[in-house]
Amino acid sequence: MQTTQQNAPLKRTMKTRHLIMLSLGGVIGTGLFFNTGYIISTTGAAGTLLAYLIGALVVWLVMQCLGELSVAMPETGAFHVYAARYLGPATGYTVAWLYWLTWTVALGSSFTAAGFCMQYWFPQVPVWVWCVVFCAIIFGLNVISTRFFAEGEFWFSLVKVVTIIAFIILGGAAIFGFIPMQDGSPAPGLSNITAEGWFPHGGLPILMTMVAVNFAFSGTELIGIAAGETENPRKVIPVAIRTTIARLIIFFIGTVFVLAALIPMQQVGVEKSPFVLVFEKVGIPYAADIFNFVILTAILSAANSGLYASGRMLWSLSNERTLPACFARVTKNGVPLTALSVSMLGGVLALFSSVVAPDTVFVALSAISGFAVVAVWLSICASHFVFRRRHLQQGKALSELHYRAPWYPLVPVLGFVLCLVACVGLAFDPAQRIALWCGLPFVALCYGAYFLTQPRNAKQEPEHVAE
């Protein structure tokens, strides 16, 4: 049995390639492979492309804010630490629990999605059986060591990146007739994109699905979580942010274009990945089986990143003395075992969603995760706004910041407003409205819990300035 150490620091073992692939691995998973079908069926092809373009803009704005903060203050559990310092300790506490909720709920939806993938080959085996199997695998990967986790995630993510590139190339060839359709029908060209009109249900569905789009992009902010375990963060983090954003925009927009062009909006949902539907339409032998396996790998990789993130958030809360000290204990390999074990309980959500109408519960779980991650993004933009303002008020030069978000204050303000608009969009979608009914009370509960449990003399977080 591994020994545990009280309040021991986490180890800085991640390199640039680990950080880039960790972020990509967290993003390329359940949201892209399954929720894209829901968005196409709701908004139409052109509406989906527009929604993802807006989502890409939001990600760019948030990551610029996070880049400046995490280079100035590279810490594990970055978001809630920044929020505590610049927005108030109660807000920091709430942000931490929101982000923990984001990834534990995402764990449940990821395991459910993985179960759907396995049912493609084994339709007689219940989804919950696969949930149990994958829970054990993901937990095992996380408890060995941080370096082992990072190496595993690097190769998982590399498989996904190569596959997405291949999908865009093959799908593009099928769109324009270079690869024949399996049923002998002519190449669709751009007909599916324009068949129902540019916006068949108007503009409101785009607003309604923005949280689902943001859920698909969630994971980019893992760069901030891993900053405290990264070698030379001042050099590594800016490179990772620039590289990750560029690749995500290319991968997501290219992938959504191929999906929207090849699948009519009436044929997509969440029971089967639209990616598998595409390769069933294209006459490539065994391509659907191969890609189903890749999707399975991608989803488990995203779950792997999610357990890492949620475990580190509990460790950080304990390290800041807002959770019992047991959560800050780490093994001799620097792994917060107790924090990981508690976070793994999110896998129970997968069992629930696989039993109770996975068609609707899965969408609701994604919406709750989407609400939570957008709320965290709100805090990142607000924290950056206050951080830069105080930096200037203290008479410090901008040149002292080794990574600077451009166009201040436009970037944090616009990022905050767009995230807020996405949350408002939930109120207009009955299928996702549950995110507000669950998310807002959860926020109130966190604030109440903070003021009830934290000593009065600990409620003022000392301000830290960037060195």
Curated annotation (Swiss-Prot):
Places the protein is found: Cell inner membrane
Mode of membrane association: Multi-pass membrane protein
Positions of transmembrane segments: 20-40, 43-63, 96-116, 125-145, 161-181, 206-226, 245-265, 282-302, 337-357, 361-381, 408-428, 434-454
Main subcellular localisation: membrane
Keywords annotated in UniProt: Cell inner membrane, Cell membrane, Membrane, Transmembrane, Transmembrane helix, Transport
GO molecular function ontology, one term from the record: S-methylmethionine transmembrane transporter activity
Record keyword Ion transport present: no
Acyltransferase listed as a keyword: no
InterPro entries: AA-permease/SLC12A_dom (IPR004841), Amino_acid_permease_CS (IPR004840)
One BP annotation, GO: methionine biosynthetic process
Gene Ontology CC, one term: plasma membrane
Purpose: Transporter for the intake of S-methylmethionine.
Family according to the record: Belongs to the amino acid-polyamine-organocation (APC) superfamily. Amino acid transporter (AAT) (TC 2.A.3.1) family.
Protein name, per record: Probable S-methylmethionine permease
Name of the gene: mmuP
